[in-house]
Amino acid sequence: PDIGLITNYGKAHLEGFGGFEGVIRGKTEMFDYLTQNYGHIILNNDDKLQIENCKGDLAVTFGENQDSEYTFKYIKRDNQLILKSEDYEFRSSIYGDYNFSNIASSISIGKFLDLTNDEIQKGLDIFKNDSNRSEIIQFGSNKIYLDAYNANPTSIKAAISNFDKEVI
C-alpha cells in the first residue's frame, strides 16, 4: 500500500493475534512497512496508542486534538453527526459517538488526496448503513439498533454507551 490508516486499536480479532498486544503488533506492521517504503500514514491523533506506535516523517494526523493537520470538532445537530473542520461542516447520517473517528478518517483521506469538500460531502451523503453495521431498523413504534457485524468487546461497549445519547 501507499497510504495506510488504522481507525483504532480495538479488542477485535483477539483469537487470531493472541491477545490485545498481538493486535497492536499486527496492526503496527503496516505502519512499519509504510515507513520503510516511503508510504503515507494517516494517524488518529486522539489515539495515544497510535501516536506511541508510529513514528514516521510521512505521517499525517487527524482528530479533535488541535495539533492535528486535519482538526475536527464533533457536533450533534439536526439528528446528524457533524464534523466541523476549519472551512466546512461535514454532515453524516451515521449514529454513534464512536463513529466520529471513522468519519474523520474518511474525510482526512479525502483531503489528503486533494478532493474538494463538496466531493467528500457527496461521498458521505451516498453512504448507506447496511450489512449489520450501524443500522437503525424501524419496527412499528420501536427502533432496533443493529451493529452486530464482527462484534467484539470494544464495539459492543461503544454501541451500548450511545443508547442514552441517542439523537436520531
Predicted features along the sequence, with ranges:
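Active-site beta-alpha connecting loops in nucleotide-dependent enzymes
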Residues: N129-N132, A148-I168
